[in-house]
Amino acid sequence: MSPSALVLDFGGPVLLTPFELVAHEPGTPAHGLLHLRGPLATAEQPDPVWEDVQAGRITERAYWAARAEQWHESGGREPDIRSMIAHLYEPPRPELVREQARALVRDARAAGHPVGILTNDLRAFHSEEWIEKIEIVGDVDVVVDGSVEGHLKPAPRLYELLSERLGVCYADMVFLDDQTTNIRGAEELGIPSVWFDVGDPDTSYAEVRKLLGLPPEVPRG
């Protein structure tokens, strides 16, 4: 029996989220809009629009388009998603990628597991030059990007494309994503899935390792 494939959403499980990056930018328009919002929102500072994303009432793309417009109105540059994302993610640098994700990909590949990235927005949010300099993208076997394919998670066709290109059936994948709508879409197809908790990444990675039969991560240092 072939090892199960590891399938990672990119933004969140692999790449730090904008909500985390703005913690280092107090006093900026981006900090005012995104700090303690999204998956890091609290009862004292809720983010009802993010809750709409999780419930499937609006798309994540619509969420970021609205935030980019607000960012512009608050003193940011152009009112488009790419400009706001570039403000946070340029230049491309190693610390944008979670160390736990690096370790998971490294260990999965060493154990013979195929590894894929299944994303909605990689090329919608980032330039080709930026993508080429984020080395983990080149460490996986397959990248399926909804912004290129014309289908966005949770549309079944995107998962189908991933299955075809990895050469594995749905039951032989383990999928990690931070959007509950995408998890539901995967589970409806029979894909074993783990919701990525931005507030508790270690627990999410540990659950994926368990499903893949990988040992717990050994901290470096």
Predicted segment positions?
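Short alpha-helical linear motifs
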Residues: 88, 108, 198-201
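Asp-based, Mg2+/Mn2+-dependent phosphohydrolase catalytic module
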Residues: 1-10, 118, 122-123, 127-221
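N-terminal helical cap/lid subdomain that shapes the substrate entry/recognition surface
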Residues: 2-103, 110
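Anion (oxyanion) recognition and catalysis
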Residues: 109-110, 187
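Short, charged low-complexity intrinsically disordered segments located at boundaries
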Residues: 54, 96-103, 116-120, 137, ...
